[in-house]
A protein has these predicted regions:
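Two-component system phosphorelay core
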Residues: 1-124
Length: 124
């Protein structure tokens, strides 16, 4: 099965070395994605978003990017790095929100791929 975001070879190698660590990383990544979902749900209907919220988002993007990279997720960490830079530079909120919603969708897909991969490995 081909994956869009999951580097299955990397995950297979890691799961042989430390299955528990892999599960912990997945749980952390899922938690951070959940926090991004909460952030999206709280976005005010009429921006601007205050600088404290923007900084919190940038920090969350940074942490989630690190988790995604640790899990061998492809493509998304680069997009997260770019969005984090946009947020930190004070880019127009409409652009940030649009990119964040797209990225959130990709993160959800990556989580699903990872979960499917792990379940398939457990079923062997």
């Amino acid at each position: 099965m081909g994956y869009r975001y999951l580097n299955a070879d990397w995950v297979a190698m890691m799961s042989q070395d430390d299955r528990e660590l892999l599960q912990d990383l997945y749980n952390l990544f899922a938690e951070q994605c959940g926090r991004l979902s909460e952030f999206l749900a709280q976005i005010p209907k009429n921006p601007p978003v205050d600088s404290q919220a923007a900084n919190a988002l940038a920090d969350l993007l940074h942490k989630t990017r690190g988790s995604a990279s640790s899990l061998g997720i492809l493509h998304i960490p680069d997009a997260m790095r770019a969005l984090e830079a946009e947020v930190r530079s004070g880019a127009a909120w409409d652009s940030v929100e649009s990119t964040l919603r797209t990225l959130h969708s990709q993160l959800s897909e990556a989580l699903g791929e990872f979960r499917s991969y792990i379940e398939a490995q457990d079923g062997r």
